[in-house]
């Protein structure tokens, strides 16, 4: 598989586990171009900070792992003006409201980063590698994403086909609610 992917937090954080899933490890080791959006960095840092309140030893281990990830040279995708504008359109869509705000009684409050990650995918025209398909499939129904790949299953759930097979065509995106 010679692809470029935007990593979702769940895929990156799988590598921090003591016994990561072998299928995810194989994906991370064989895909030559993996990109980390700043939204993922925020979620990882949020998780480490939350863990530090209850398990400082684990937080130190995760912090060391995070520093290793940062030194590994993964390209970091910053929130550019284009990403921010797309993110704003997605965040304003009432169909995606629960991804941005979440439910008051949810076990894990939402932080809106799946919508932010989708904005990166749309702006950069790159597929997302995720195991969190439900949220991204909802976004895809509203705003077709360039692709959703689940490395745990080694399966595409959404994949845009080229308009003309064998010919690269730059896609232009028009976002309207």
Residue positions per predicted region:
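Generic structural signal for small/hydrophobic residues in well-ordered secondary structure
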Residues: 8-9, 44, 87, 121, ...
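Short, well-structured N-terminal submotif of metal-dependent ribonuclease cores
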Residues: 1-67, 170-177
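A structural signal for well-ordered alpha-helical segments within the folded catalytic domains
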Residues: 42, 81, 85, 115-122
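Acidic catalytic patch
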Residues: 70-107
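Acidic, PIN/NYN-like endoribonuclease modules and their adjacent C-terminal/linker elements
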Residues: 118, 122-177
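Residues that scaffold the ATP/ADP-binding catalytic core of kinase and kinase-like folds
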Residues: 14-15, 47, 86-90, 139
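Short active-site oxyanion
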Residues: 2, 31-34, 73-75, 122-127
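Conserved glycosyltransferase catalytic-site signature
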Residues: 9, 81, 111-115, 133
């Amino acid at each position: 598989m010679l692809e470029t992917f935007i990593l979702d937090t769940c895929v990156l954080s799988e590598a921090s586990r003591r016994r990561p899933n072998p299928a995810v490890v194989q994906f991370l080791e064989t895909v030559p171009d993996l990109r980390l959006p700043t939204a993922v960095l925020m979620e990882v840092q949020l998780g480490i900070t939350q863990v530090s309140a209850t398990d400082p030893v684990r937080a130190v281990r995760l912090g060391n792992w995070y520093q290793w990830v940062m030194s590994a040279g993964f390209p970091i995708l910053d929130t550019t003006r284009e990403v921010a504008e797309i993110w704003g359109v997605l965040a304003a869509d009432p169909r995606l409201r629960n991804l941005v705000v979440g439910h008051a009684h949810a076990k894990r409050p939402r932080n809106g980063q799946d919508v932010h990650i989708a904005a990166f995918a749309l702006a950069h025209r790159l597929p997302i590698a995720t195991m969190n398909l439900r949220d991204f499939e909802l976004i895809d129904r509203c705003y077709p994403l360039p692709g959703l790949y689940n490395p745990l299953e080694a399966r595409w759930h959404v994949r845009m086909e080229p308009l003309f097979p064998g010919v690269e065509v730059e896609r232009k995106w028009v976002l309207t609610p």
